[in-house]
């Protein structure tokens, strides 16, 4: 799925929020899974920065539907706890 660069950064913020809530609620599994997602998103961000450096402004980012599904699943799991 293609999202804007701003939406990508909002996703990163959401995953960080999930991690912080999981940490405060001592939910080990959600902490581990959200930290894995944070690493994946950081890798995408590094690629984005490199692309912008070499090719100019990037307007959209393609995110795997699986990653979006995992974020949604973890968010629901932590909020409904």
UniProtKB/Swiss-Prot annotation:
<protein>
    <recommendedName>
        <fullName>Uncharacterized 9.5 kDa protein in dexA-dda intergenic region</fullName>
    </recommendedName>
</protein>
<keyword id="KW-1017">Isopeptide bond</keyword>
<feature type="cross-link" description="Glycyl lysine isopeptide (Lys-Gly) (interchain with G-Cter in host protein DncV)">
    <location>
        <position position="5"/>
    </location>
</feature>
């Amino acid at each position: 799925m293609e999202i804007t660069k701003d939406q990508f950064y909002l996703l990163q913020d959401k995953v960080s929020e999930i991690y912080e809530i999981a940490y405060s609620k001592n939910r080990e599994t959600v902490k581990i899974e959200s930290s894995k997602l944070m690493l994946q998103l950081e890798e995408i961000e590094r690629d984005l920065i490199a692309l912008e450096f070499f090719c100019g402004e990037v307007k959209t980012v393609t995110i795997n539907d699986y990653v979006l599904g995992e974020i949604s699943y973890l968010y629901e799991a932590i909020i409904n706890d």
